[in-house]
Amino acid sequence: MTIALGKFTKDEKDLFDIMDDWLRRDRFVFVGWSGLLLFPCAYFALGGWFTGTTFVTSWYTHGLASSYLEGCNFLTAAVSTPANSLAHSLLLLWGPKAQGDFTRWCQLGGLWAFVALHGAFALIGFMLRQFELARSVQLRPYNAIAFSGPIAVFVSVFLIYPLGQSGWFFAPSFGVAAIFRFILFFQGFHNWTLNPFHMMGVAGVLGAALLCAIHGATVENTLFEDGDGANTFRAFNPTQAEETYSMVTANRFWSQIFGVAFSNKRWLHFFMLFVPVTGLWMSALGVVGLALNLRAYDFVSQEIRAAEDPEFETFYTKNILLNEGIRAWMAAQDQPHENLIFPEEVLPRGNAL
């Protein structure tokens, strides 16, 4: 019996092959199968955000002006979260809340749900785009893995946190000043800066910035001067076989500065990937914990002593009082429908008052 080995070839292309060629090969800018998710979702998310910040008020959900039409600027305009009474409703345009009325849908905060969900899928589509293109040109998938960090932060902050709370109302609104207010809310209600996951996130992001600065400066310091423009892009070309900078010289320099240095480019660049991505993932895990109302570090002994001794106060106890002030102010301001009224004696004051 004879067995013929060879590559199977089809005589004619089926619909899948035609679509595959159209999406991945027959164009200058790569679209890909991931583009079927990325481009529509990104278009709708950005379009919804521009529409909301330009025209839509937050009067009915937050009692605020939030659009350019009402006098806001780029820093104060926002697409605001739905009202607290709407809980976790998806706020579909054709759903029982809006009943197909576009104006009512906007007034209820439907654009926020629209932007958040389409934005999440757009980010996932962008990560899949990196996977798909890397596979097409036979690259490893570390770009996509790195981009999982921002996706984890977005999903945890905008989706998982409000799902753990009483409604979408407690998610951040999509705007600059709105995000700042959400950060203050996180500090006041969760003592976020004293959360170990936040500390790891800060270490990751700032550590990555430090690594990038050191790496860029070191490469610039150790360039081979083998052209008439060694300090510009003119001296080198993308296909050169030679190294652009001297790793040996860089290693000797940092060995003298710190006593230790990276001796391997692969380990160096993996570390530059590992630090920020791990920091972002730790932050995302911390926000998931906040969704479940897990607490940060508590130094109760200091709080008890500060309450008993008027002369004893630490930066920690001062921050706890500050958090109480944030809660007392924001609870009444952000939830006017609750009619929260705090008498003077419950408002926080330091030992100095």
Curated annotation (Swiss-Prot):
<keyword id="KW-0472">Membrane</keyword>
<keyword id="KW-0150">Chloroplast</keyword>
<dbReference type="InterPro" id="IPR005868">
    <property type="entry name" value="PSII_PsbD/D2"/>
</dbReference>
<feature type="transmembrane region" description="Helical">
    <location>
        <begin position="125"/>
        <end position="141"/>
    </location>
</feature>
<feature type="binding site">
    <location>
        <position position="262"/>
    </location>
    <ligand>
        <name>a plastoquinone</name>
    </ligand>
</feature>
<keyword id="KW-0597">Phosphoprotein</keyword>
<keyword id="KW-0408">Iron</keyword>
<dbReference type="GO" id="GO:0045156">
    <property type="term" value="F:electron transporter, transferring electrons within the cyclic electron transport pathway of photosynthesis activity"/>
</dbReference>
<feature type="binding site" description="axial binding residue">
    <location>
        <position position="118"/>
    </location>
    <ligand>
        <name>chlorophyll a ChlzD2</name>
    </ligand>
</feature>
<feature type="modified residue" description="N-acetylthreonine">
    <location>
        <position position="2"/>
    </location>
</feature>
<keyword id="KW-0934">Plastid</keyword>
<protein>
    <recommendedName>
        <fullName>Photosystem II D2 protein</fullName>
        <ecNumber>1.10.3.9</ecNumber>
    </recommendedName>
</protein>
<dbReference type="InterPro" id="IPR055265">
    <property type="entry name" value="Photo_RC_L/M_CS"/>
</dbReference>
<dbReference type="InterPro" id="IPR036854">
    <property type="entry name" value="Photo_II_D1/D2_sf"/>
</dbReference>
<keyword id="KW-0157">Chromophore</keyword>
<feature type="binding site">
    <location>
        <position position="215"/>
    </location>
    <ligand>
        <name>Fe cation</name>
    </ligand>
</feature>
<feature type="transmembrane region" description="Helical">
    <location>
        <begin position="41"/>
        <end position="61"/>
    </location>
</feature>
<dbReference type="GO" id="GO:0010242">
    <property type="term" value="F:oxygen evolving activity"/>
</dbReference>
<keyword id="KW-0602">Photosynthesis</keyword>
<feature type="transmembrane region" description="Helical">
    <location>
        <begin position="153"/>
        <end position="166"/>
    </location>
</feature>
<feature type="transmembrane region" description="Helical">
    <location>
        <begin position="279"/>
        <end position="295"/>
    </location>
</feature>
<keyword id="KW-0813">Transport</keyword>
<feature type="binding site">
    <location>
        <position position="143"/>
    </location>
    <ligand>
        <name>pheophytin a</name>
    </ligand>
</feature>
<feature type="binding site" description="axial binding residue">
    <location>
        <position position="198"/>
    </location>
    <ligand>
        <name>chlorophyll a PD2</name>
    </ligand>
</feature>
<dbReference type="GO" id="GO:0005506">
    <property type="term" value="F:iron ion binding"/>
</dbReference>
<feature type="binding site">
    <location>
        <position position="215"/>
    </location>
    <ligand>
        <name>a plastoquinone</name>
    </ligand>
</feature>
<keyword id="KW-0793">Thylakoid</keyword>
<comment type="function">
    <text>Photosystem II (PSII) is a light-driven water:plastoquinone oxidoreductase that uses light energy to abstract electrons from H(2)O, generating O(2) and a proton gradient subsequently used for ATP formation. It consists of a core antenna complex that captures photons, and an electron transfer chain that converts photonic excitation into a charge separation. The D1/D2 (PsbA/PsbD) reaction center heterodimer binds P680, the primary electron donor of PSII as well as several subsequent electron acceptors. D2 is needed for assembly of a stable PSII complex.</text>
</comment>
<keyword id="KW-1133">Transmembrane helix</keyword>
<feature type="modified residue" description="Phosphothreonine">
    <location>
        <position position="2"/>
    </location>
</feature>
<dbReference type="Pfam" id="PF00124">
    <property type="entry name" value="Photo_RC"/>
</dbReference>
<dbReference type="InterPro" id="IPR000484">
    <property type="entry name" value="Photo_RC_L/M"/>
</dbReference>
<keyword id="KW-0560">Oxidoreductase</keyword>
<keyword id="KW-0812">Transmembrane</keyword>
<feature type="binding site">
    <location>
        <position position="130"/>
    </location>
    <ligand>
        <name>pheophytin a</name>
    </ligand>
</feature>
<keyword id="KW-0479">Metal-binding</keyword>
<comment type="subunit">
    <text>PSII is composed of 1 copy each of membrane proteins PsbA, PsbB, PsbC, PsbD, PsbE, PsbF, PsbH, PsbI, PsbJ, PsbK, PsbL, PsbM, PsbT, PsbX, PsbY, PsbZ, Psb30/Ycf12, at least 3 peripheral proteins of the oxygen-evolving complex and a large number of cofactors. It forms dimeric complexes.</text>
</comment>
<dbReference type="InterPro" id="IPR055266">
    <property type="entry name" value="D1/D2"/>
</dbReference>
<keyword id="KW-0148">Chlorophyll</keyword>
<dbReference type="GO" id="GO:0009772">
    <property type="term" value="P:photosynthetic electron transport in photosystem II"/>
</dbReference>
<feature type="binding site">
    <location>
        <position position="269"/>
    </location>
    <ligand>
        <name>Fe cation</name>
    </ligand>
</feature>
<dbReference type="GO" id="GO:0009523">
    <property type="term" value="C:photosystem II"/>
</dbReference>
